[in-house]
């Protein structure tokens, strides 16, 4: 909490890593804020500014215990050395033995930030030992306009490199192995996962789940040359080549 002079007055200890939004008037002694995370659905809290305390005001009922899970934010180096952030959510008793399935999600475009948020469809995967990994690729706006621009047009390759480096980090740190990673993206993220097997065939991610983007709409023609030149094998006619499984919808 900061005053109008920009100085920090106090710090609110949130339930976990997550996303928060406040509402209220500047003269109020109490205000409300909404909080959500990868394992906590949207809840509303009432905050007492004088006491620096808050209490749960309203929350949906769920049939699982969010305390069974943990979310951490890690940083890894991309191909050019830039540090890239990634959120990892998994059960507290998970063993880093390189055998855990990973659901790796990325977007990396249009200045859109990927903040922590809840989805009920992820919970069964987490309960069964899976890891949900959400990587903040360049092209988003997590670190401002420079971060956005660094993943656009002739710098679009940075987005692919960031995503590949995320998968490599998860393997190197024994969260998983190359046979246990599913890469997922939709819309702009569909472009990302469609081209990943082209750019990193040696990683051989087992499964991709994506929607079809309008690939060339916002990309210079000459940037598309590396996409095709790095893929010497016909995609639709494999001629005995083994491509990662892809599901397009």
Each predicted region: which residue ranges?
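Peripheral, non-catalytic segments that deliver or gate enzyme domains
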Residues: 1-99, 110-128, 168-172
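Conserved catalytic motifs of the protein kinase core domain
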Residues: 99-101, 180
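A fold-wide structural signal in alpha/beta-hydrolase
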Residues: 102, 126-136
């Amino acid at each position: 909490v900061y005053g109008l002079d920009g100085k920090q007055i106090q710090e609110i200890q949130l339930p976990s890593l997550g996303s928060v939004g406040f509402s209220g008037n500047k003269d109020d002694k109490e205000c409300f804020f909404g909080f959500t995370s990868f394992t906590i659905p949207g809840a509303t809290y009432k905050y007492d500014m004088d006491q620096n305390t808050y209490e749960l005001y309203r929350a949906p009922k769920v049939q699982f215990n969010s305390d069974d899970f943990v979310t951490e934010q890690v940083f890894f180096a991309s191909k050019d050395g830039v540090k890239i952030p990634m959120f990892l959510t998994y059960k507290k008793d998970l063993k880093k033995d390189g055998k855990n399935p990973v659901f790796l999600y990325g977007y990396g475009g249009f200045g859109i930030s990927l903040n922590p948020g809840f989805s009920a469809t992820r919970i069964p995967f987490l309960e069964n030992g899976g890891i949900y990994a959400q990587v903040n690729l360049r092209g988003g706006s997590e670190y401002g306009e420079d971060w956005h621009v660094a993943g656009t047009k002739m710098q679009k390759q940075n987005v692919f490199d960031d995503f590949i480096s995320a998968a490599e980090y998860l393997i190197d740190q024994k969260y998983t192995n190359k046979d246990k990673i599913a890469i997922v993206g939709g819309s702009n993220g569909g472009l990302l996962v469609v081209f990943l097997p082209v750019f990193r065939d040696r990683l051989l991610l087992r499964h991709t789940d994506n929607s079809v983007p309008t690939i060339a709409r916002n990309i210079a023609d000459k940037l598309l040359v590396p996409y095709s030149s790095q893929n010497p094998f016909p995609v639709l006619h494999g001629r005995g080549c083994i491509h990662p499984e892809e599901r397009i919808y």
